[in-house]
Amino acid sequence: NPALVNRQVVGVFDRKLLMIFAKGLKNLNIKFAWIVNSEDGLDEISPYAKTNVIQLKDGKISEIIIDAKTLNVNAEKFENLIGDDSNFNADKMIEIFKGKDNDFSKAVCLNAAAGLIVGEKFTEFSDAYKFAREFILTGKPYSHLEKIQNV
């Protein structure tokens, strides 16, 4: 990563790559990382299925399972996360930023929670998810987007 970050959330498309990536990031002296792959094939934390996480923290590697059901995510169906062209995807992102409660926003909040954990803003995933969810649903991210657009 040209940004020289020492904390990362990395999604991989195949569970077999989890440990390979963890060891690679360890060799790069990454301080804290989550490498994720969901059991429904997503390269991110899934709102529909368990997600396998390899955590690299301060040189130590451990395994975690994230289960959205235990967080009461209540996402409806996998097909709801299927994107389309860039206009469709941009519209969905705007809806999320405006606080729309749907499967897209739930997926975004789960993965934002991972970033909050790796950034050491929270130690418990459930707390990080709750924070991300409450913030997204306020619609405040859209206000921030408007400020950026007007710069």
Regions found by a protein language model. Give the residues of each.
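Glycine-rich anion-binding loops and their surrounding alpha/beta cores
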Residues: 1-151
